[in-house]
Amino acid sequence: MPKRTDIQKIMVIGSGPIIIGQAAEFDYAGTQACLSLKEEGYEVVLVNSNPATIMTDKEIADKVYIEPITLEFVTRILRKERPDALLPTLGGQTGLNMAMELSKNGILDELGVEFLGTRLSAIDQAEDRDLFKQLMEELEQPIPESEIVNTVEEAIAFAATIGYPVIVRPAFTLGGTGGGMCANEKELREITENGLKLSPVTQCLIERSIAGFKEIEYEVMRDSADNALVVCNMENFDPVGIHTGDSIVFAPAQTMSDYENQMLRDASLSIIRALKIEGGCNVQLALDPNSFKYYVIEVNPRVSRSSALASKATGYPIAKLAAKIAVGLTLDEVINPVTGSTYAMFEPALDYVVAKIPRFPFDKFEKGERRLGTQMKATGEVMAIGRNIEESLLKACRSLEIGVHHNEIPELAAVSDDALIEKVVKAQDDRLFYVSEAIRRGYTPEEIAELTKIDIFYLDKLLHIFEIEQELGAHPQDLEVLKTAKLNGFSDRKIAELWGTTDDQVRQLRLENKIVPVYKMVDTCAAEFDSETPYFYSTYGWENESIRSDKESVLVLGSGPIRIGQGVEFDYATVHSVKAIQAAGYEAIIMNSNPETVSTDFSVSDKLYFEPLTFEDVMNVIDLEQPKGVIVQFGGQTAINLAEPLAKAGVTILGTQVADLDRAEDRDLFEQALKELDIPQPPGQTATNEEEAALAARKIGFPVLVRPSYVLGGRAMEIVENEEDLRSYMRTAVKASPDHPVLVDSYIVGQECEVDAISDGKNVLIPGIMEHIERAGVHSGDSMAVYPPQTLSQKVQETIADYTKRLAIGLHCLGMMNIQFVIKDEKVYVIEVNPRASRTVPFLSKVTNIPMAQVATKLILGQSLSELGYQNGLYPESTRVHIKAPVFSFTKLAKVDSLLGPEMKSTGEVMGSDATLEKALYKAFEASYLHLPTFGNVVFTIADDAKEEALNLARRFQNIGYGILATEGTAAFFASHGLQAQPVGKIGDDDKDIPSFVRKGRIQAIINTVGTKRTADEDGEQIRRSAIEHGVPLFTALDTANAMLKVLESRSFVTEAI
């Protein structure tokens, strides 16, 4: 059926900020879909609140609205644009929920807007637990016995009839939020109570636990002519019971018989046909390992995390085709873009194995609850491709960037057997490494399978890896064993470790004996047809399929998995850099390991290598491609850390040189550079042990900011107020050494701001200055940033511009750099300089209309700013006000404190833009899900040093009609200054303490600051946790509360009797 001509304008809803459970895969899907619709001649209107994505670039849609995804704003845009249709299946759960809300609200009917791709009834049938159950019964598809409940009592009654363990699944929440496994009534009571609160319809499903079954997923497509096919099936290494987003996944499935595969394939196709979905759909099933019994777990009637993985694993572009199907095209009339010759109506065949491993944030959250269950905790993921399971698994392990280069964490050797087995049974984020350690200790695959329900097939593979380790250890320098190890994915570093030699010597031995990888093409058809995709993976085998072109090439290193501190912003810069390389006439090659992102879409670059970002893997590609040089400044710390080893190996680093990167990152060299340039910085010293640190702090004077050198996202950074806290920090938080000193700086409480600058070596373009709302001490990635600055004097702005130019020229910066300043009493100090693209690049590019990463790349390749038409210095300001606000994922991470400080905690960002600061702030708060009603109660629990300032805020809250509550000390202070606040207990005062007020819905906002003694703050942590769990806006910085007040004041009216 040809495409529809009765619709011209289509609205696409994006997925908003990146949170755990909804990451960059939707930027990838949304970008593909918008371009796919434009390609067919439709006008595309996009709404998304996330500035950090490629999807919200002007070129992606005809009209791009970076506005909050809320009923209020989307309705406005619908009325203004009047689209003919809405495509809701590409914006994750956020997009789906928004579409449902618009539909229930009646606005779509009023404007005559129709749904494309998936009918509303199908979304309801897949998402609403009751309707889903009815549909499965009609199709005679087995589902675990379950009951829908609206109260805790109903849950307990049902569990009594089927027996424990049971699983709780709240309706309409994302990534399993609020759900969990319950072994007894106490756990059931706790989890159901929380789940009912988090479900927008106060509804939970209680179901029989089928933990221990194999978890299998099918990614299926269907069109309006009822053609349906399976793109890919996937098998979780972890059995049912761990959220699929937190599981290690292999594609294609490895342990099913042909009969089982056909059985589950038929089930999946019958479900997508019954739901009449036009587009992509994901079906999750549980298979009993001991019989042919299976259950349908759930169906996602939209593009999902798994479909991004399936697209990258097979090369079959699901989102692109889903968009074409949504407008009426059928699978047998769309050409498969991979082969360019076959149609999309065929099932991809794979002649390789793909492994996906999730990336967790627990390196940043040491206190976080690491036990895995039905609620997702990973922030990102890596994928690796190999010719066997061992190879793809080991390549994925070294892609994770958690300091491992094999399926082994050396520290685990010291763990006792009992502790080891407990971790093997009770899965944490690092279970793979514990299981591998158990095998090294002689536990058999059978014993471990019994304990974990992991299929023995995978455990045998781990045993095989261990056997190769032993072979290597027994035969140093043996070429045959070396070949075997390389065929199974071993890194040079692991081999060097077992041989007691260096990585470099292993590499030399390989090169001398021509043991080098070949590159194979991902072609969707197991080489059955000719293919034209430039998408490759390495393996040690025969016949290299990646042919070097005659054109000069440039290699761009991506940023690897998404984690806190290094998010999708760096992928954004990578993609823009590629566009500029191509425009300059070079071949652009990308190397990256993240399946969720736009940069690993094979149509973005001239060549894509899906490989780990390690020295060995990068050098292998360089040896083959011989590029003109490598660009490292867009891949975050991942790529920057590779600059030095690559340069030592004789590779040309394009842009700022390694020696200059070092001058910005190495403390002593940096201080020296600032002295030479006559730029002030807060007084500070380096320390290599506890005594040196104490001495430095006494000299500088408390408070001090302490942190390790060379980190991204403020890992292990703290503000300490006294020597006792400093000593405990040095003992527990960091492993200081002469190689890894700790920086001790005077902590200046001032206004913080940052600048991104682009330099060609002679001139410096400063697109804009961003002012932070939170004062210094909150990590820049967790601060709200305002552009253009609202409170900085002309003199301060000129000083900032002057220092920026001096630094860029003085540090020989070529390309991008980011500088953070703190201002106190009109004096400007430099806090830090990053000689690379930073996380503010997408935001600043969008609000200034300067494609910063593209400009930087053109300068790196030899053009000058004047040739590109840019002047030297600060770019003229925009007249509108733009705010970048952080978004957090605390609801997903139990035991992680939501208190803001110098260590970054946000997972994503939103943008609010309008004519005034207050309006822009309102949008930013709305977009980041911080919605404050216009009346209610606000609680203050404030540290002594901030009570004075909090008093002023409390008065202003009272003036606009809020009731003021406060904890004992704060209430007494307020009373002594003439403000009566209702006293409320902190913790443990039964039904009079803050958490119980929160549970009863009597509190609309909490303002909680923490004093200098962090130790005494367990109460505060419980208060903050209760706010997070009940969705009550929480402010741990008075500046953020002040910004919210400005919004409320601008929206409130004074009513007074005459």
From Swiss-Prot:
Top EC group: ligase
Keyword vocabulary terms for this entry: Amino-acid biosynthesis, Arginine biosynthesis, ATP-binding, Ligase, Magnesium, Manganese, Metal-binding, Nucleotide-binding, Pyrimidine biosynthesis, Repeat
State the source organism's domain of life: Bacteria
Q: Which residues form a coiled coil?
A: none
Quote the record's binding site residues for Mn(2+) 4. 832, 834
UniProt key word Lipoprotein: no
Q: Which residues form the MGS-like domain?
A: 930-1058
Q: What is its EC number?
A: 6.3.4.16, 6.3.5.5
Q: Which residues bind Mg(2+) 2?
A: 298, 300
Q: Which amino acids does the record list as binding Mn(2+) 1?
A: 284, 298
Subunit comment: Composed of two chains; the small (or glutamine) chain promotes the hydrolysis of glutamine to ammonia, which is used by the large (or ammonia) chain to synthesize carbamoyl phosphate. Tetramer of heterodimers (alpha,beta)4.
Write out the domain note. The large subunit is composed of 2 ATP-grasp domains that are involved in binding the 2 ATP molecules needed for carbamoyl phosphate synthesis. The N-terminal ATP-grasp domain (referred to as the carboxyphosphate synthetic component) catalyzes the ATP-dependent phosphorylation of hydrogencarbonate to carboxyphosphate and the subsequent nucleophilic attack by ammonia to form a carbamate intermediate.
> What is the name of the protein in this document?
Carbamoyl phosphate synthase large chain
Q: Which organism is it from?
A: Streptococcus pneumoniae (strain Hungary19A-6)
